[in-house]
């Protein structure tokens, strides 16, 4: 299957962005591997530390998953699409760059250098682990139990990695292997609709699972 033609404004923005923002030394594959391996190491270490988990402690997984889905939704609907003081970098990278690099008419990468426009910068995972997952985990360790703390960290980082992997796959070509699975077709369609400039500020803010979009009535109905 031939890739659809890229609209000229998108092609022009991509060329300008690559020249200005992507170093010739950048490796999209190494970027993807860093995100994946770092996340998996943290998840693996956290799981290794679990012992004798009670039913109450297992509830941490569900609660953390729902919490992460809400944070994903609010972060995307809020500062990623509306400029907020001190968080303007998120708005610039997401709305002014990501949504111009990829539109509903041109969703796919043209090469591995384009991974930079989808994956969070490597420093983000260090920020997320060091300034969110670990501090909250330490707090839970002292307020609840060791298992709750490690279950929170494993689930939170697992959710982050799921976000990165799914978002990465949405921007593969439609005829790629992941894109052929029915559930991926549905999630990809929702994200493609979100990349329509006429819809992006109002619909389909969940990148992973559209739980909050259903709850808050922001899932786009075709």
How would you describe each model-predicted region?
Residues 1-42, 119:
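Cytosolic-side membrane-entry/anchor segment at the start of a transmembrane helix
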Residues 18-28, 32, 51-54, 146, ...:
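Membrane-water interface of alpha-helical transmembrane segments
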Residues 19, 52, 57-60, 64, ...:
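Generic hydrophobic alpha-helical membrane-segment signal
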Residues 28-47, 125-140:
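Hydrophobic core of alpha-helical transmembrane segments in multi-pass integral membrane proteins
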Residues 34-38, 61, 65, 156, ...:
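Hydrophobic alpha-helical transmembrane segments of polytopic
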Residues 43-59, 138-151:
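Helix-coil boundary and interhelical linker segments in multi-pass alpha-helical membrane proteins
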Residues 59-75:
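N-terminal signal-anchor transmembrane alpha helix
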Residues 70-153, 157-222:
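Membrane-embedded catalytic scaffold of the fatty acid hydroxylase/desaturase
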């Amino acid at each position: 299957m031939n890739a659809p033609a890229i609209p000229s404004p998108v092609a022009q923005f991509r060329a300008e962005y690559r020249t200005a923002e992507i170093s010739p030394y950048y490796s999209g594959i190494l970027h993807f591997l860093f995100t994946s391996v770092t996340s998996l190491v943290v998840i693996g270490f956290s799981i290794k530390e679990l012992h004798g988990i009670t039913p109450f402690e297992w509830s941490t997984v569900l609660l953390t998953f729902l919490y992460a889905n809400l944070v994903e939704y609010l972060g995307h609907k809020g500062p990623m699409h509306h400029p907020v003081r001190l968080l303007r970098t998120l708005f610039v990278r997401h709305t002014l760059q990501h949504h111009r690099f990829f539109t509903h008419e041109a969703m796919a990468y043209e090469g591995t250098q384009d991974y930079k426009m989808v994956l969070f910068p490597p420093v983000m995972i260090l920020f997320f682990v060091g300034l969110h997952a670990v501090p909250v985990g330490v707090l839970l360790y002292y307020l609840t139990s060791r298992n709750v703390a490690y279950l929170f960290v494993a689930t939170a980082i697992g959710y982050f990695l799921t976000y990165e992997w799914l978002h990465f796959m949405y921007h593969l070509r439609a005829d790629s292997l992941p894109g052929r699975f029915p559930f991926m077709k549905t999630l990809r369609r929702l994200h493609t609709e979100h990349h329509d400039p006429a819809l992006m500020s109002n619909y389909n803010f969940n990148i992973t699972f559209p739980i909050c979009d259903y709850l808050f009535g922001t899932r786009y109905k075709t």
